[in-house]
């Protein structure tokens, strides 16, 4: 046929059987990728330390999505929470991966069958005998089935009525586990961080989809609307489908980047805004203050801070710190976290407690500045020592650790104090193993960053695709050069210029 590469899909334009075939093959590819990727991730995933080396630090992409839907156990005998399991059942990580691969194979065979047996009676208009599809009816069928699936997910899977529930955690990502969720029917259901909204919205949207599907199955579109929106043209279906997909992609890019109940930080890592707002830092200080109010010592109060909470308060876990084109997991960047060294408290020779000003998200380097509780600069690591007034040496800064591995240890020599001041810029201080993975020390983004970038980018591309195909189908007659008011029958090839009788071709 000699089609250019960007027009090859025209071969299925008026061929419903093979149009179905290529869509089944596409489903096979998607499902096969998901299953294969899951098996690859399971082969390289280390479940031994869910606190300091969780899935998002290791660059896992599909494991978090399985986990948030209720999969927590492996046939390898481990659980995502760090324990061991003896009977993981069929729906383990490997079981889900295998099911996707089996489904992919079945779709592959179905695609071949429909490619070979493309000329089925069901695709033919009984009045004309030519291939045609009743697109409004097909729309109603799909809407009804999607509504049933949506309702079923919300009413059964999420609520635990028939299913495991979903991953639910506290606001600080410490106590996450899979549990049943009751629908939230009040105003709180519209809070993106309330898990109950997931159940209620799926039930409501599913009900609406079922009713809308039944409506479109039982009511035919008016003729003027049918013609005006080109409902008989398959490219209209393509255009509106692309619109649905790019809209969904924009929405999930937002819920992933800004955070929501559907993207728990235990599975995808913290958001950049939690670093920007000092979210975990404030919670840590609140817990320490509560401990001091209970007459605990500073050391005891800091020792009660969960290592998991301290680890969230580290800039290396900020998804906006990794460049878009720095390939690899977070562990390949700053290394595998081994342990929390403790919280450093800096003091000058007059006994004032000093606080290191933290590095903002979009800085690669930042001056080391120590301020007192009133925000007055008291010490720094100067760029030019000849002009310094607040250097660690001049001010006599010391550091003492509370909690963690260095609990109770203090340093007064300036070189060590400056080392820990620099590291305190990056949040809580952790010992990082860079040797095991030959980590290069350059921060990487988490799966939260990759997912957002990918979906925002493709949403933009698909937006243009929607405009393109929508314009093609709405203005098809204009682009083809056919006057819609032309009464005479126009036969392509009769005239050199379509519809212009003065350019009639000579018969051969």
Curated annotation (Swiss-Prot):
GO terms for cellular component: chloroplast thylakoid membrane; photosystem II. It is found in: Plastid, Chloroplast thylakoid membrane. The chain crosses the membrane at residues 21-36, 101-115, 140-156, 203-218, 237-252, 457-472. Binds multiple chlorophylls. PSII binds additional chlorophylls, carotenoids and specific lipids. Gene3D superfamilies: Photosystem II CP47 reaction center protein. Keywords: Chlorophyll, Chloroplast, Chromophore, Membrane, Photosynthesis, Photosystem II, Plastid, Thylakoid, Transmembrane, Transmembrane helix. It comes from the Eukaryota. It holds the Pfam family PSII. GO terms for biological process: photosynthetic electron transport in photosystem II. Its main location: plastid. It is a multi-pass membrane protein. GO terms for molecular function: chlorophyll binding; electron transporter, transferring electrons within the cyclic electron transport pathway of photosynthesis activity. One of the components of the core complex of photosystem II (PSII). It binds chlorophyll and helps catalyze the primary light-induced photochemical processes of PSII. PSII is a light-driven water:plastoquinone oxidoreductase, using light energy to abstract electrons from H(2)O, generating O(2) and a proton gradient subsequently used for ATP formation. PSII is composed of 1 copy each of membrane proteins PsbA, PsbB, PsbC, PsbD, PsbE, PsbF, PsbH, PsbI, PsbJ, PsbK, PsbL, PsbM, PsbT, PsbX, PsbY, PsbZ, Psb30/Ycf12, at least 3 peripheral proteins of the oxygen-evolving complex and a large number of cofactors. It forms dimeric complexes. NCBIfam families: PS_II_CP47. Belongs to the PsbB/PsbC family. PsbB subfamily. This is Photosystem II CP47 reaction center protein. It comes from Sorghum bicolor. The gene is psbB.
């Amino acid at each position: 046929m000699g089609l250019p590469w960007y027009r090859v899909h025209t071969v299925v334009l008026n061929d419903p059987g093979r149009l179905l075939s290529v869509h089944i093959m596409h489903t096979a590819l998607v499902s096969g990728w998901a299953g294969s990727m899951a098996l690859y991730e399971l082969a390289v995933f280390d479940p031994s330390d869910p606190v300091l080396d969780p899935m998002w630090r290791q660059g896992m992409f599909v494991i978090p999505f399985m986990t948030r839907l209720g999969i927590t156990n492996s046939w390898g005998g481990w659980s995502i929470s760090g324990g061991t399991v003896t009977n993981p059942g069929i729906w383990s990580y490997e079981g889900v991966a295998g099911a996707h691969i089996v489904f992919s194979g079945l779709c592959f065979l179905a695609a071949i069958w429909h490619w070979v047996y493309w000329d089925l009676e069901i695709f033919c208009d009984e009045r004309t005998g030519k291939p045609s599809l009743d697109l409004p009816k097909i729309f109603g069928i799909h809407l009804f089935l999607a509504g049933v699936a949506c309702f079923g997910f919300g009413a059964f899977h999420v609520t635990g009525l028939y299913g495991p529930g979903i991953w639910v955690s506290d606001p600080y990502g410490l106590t996450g586990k899979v549990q049943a969720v009751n629908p939230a029917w009040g105003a709180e259901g519209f809070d993106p961080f309330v898990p109950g909204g997931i159940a209620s919205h799926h039930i409501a949207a599913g009900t609406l989809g079922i009713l809308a599907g039944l409506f479109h199955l039982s009511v035919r579109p008016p003729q003027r609307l049918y013609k005006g929106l080109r409902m008989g043209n398959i490219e209209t279906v393509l255009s509106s489908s692309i619109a649905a997909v790019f809209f969904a992609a924009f929405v999930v890019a937002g819920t992933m980047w800004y955070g929501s109940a559907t993207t728990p930080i235990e599975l995808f890592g913290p958001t950049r805004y939690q670093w920007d707002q000092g979210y975990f830092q404030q919670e840590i200080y609140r817990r320490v203050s509560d401990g001091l109010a209970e007459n605990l010592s500073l050391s005891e109060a800091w020792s009660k801070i969960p290592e998991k909470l301290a680890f969230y308060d580290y800039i290396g876990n900020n998804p906006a710190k990794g460049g878009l084109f720095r390939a690899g997991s977070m562990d390949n960047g700053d290394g595998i976290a081994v342990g929390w060294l403790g919280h450093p408290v800096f003091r000058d020779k007059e006994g004032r407690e000093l606080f290191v000003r933290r590095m903002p998200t979009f800085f690669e380097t930042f001056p080391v500045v120590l301020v007192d509780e009133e925000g007055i600069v008291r010490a720094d690591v100067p760029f030019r020592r000849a002009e310094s007034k607040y250097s660690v040496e001049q001010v006599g800064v010391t550091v003492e650790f509370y909690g963690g591995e260095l609990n109770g240890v203090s340093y007064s020599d300036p070189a060590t104090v400056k080392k820990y001041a620099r590291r305190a810029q990056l949040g809580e201080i952790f010992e990082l193993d860079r040797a095991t993975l030959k980590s290069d020390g350059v921060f990487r983004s988490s799966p939260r960053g990759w997912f957002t970038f990918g979906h925002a980018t493709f949403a933009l591309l698909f937006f243009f695709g929607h405009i393109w195909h929508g314009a093609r189908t709405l203005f098809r007659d204009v682009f083809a050069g056919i006057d819609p008011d032309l009464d005479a029958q126009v036969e392509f090839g009769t005239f050199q210029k379509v519809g212009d009788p003065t350019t009639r071709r000579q018969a051969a």
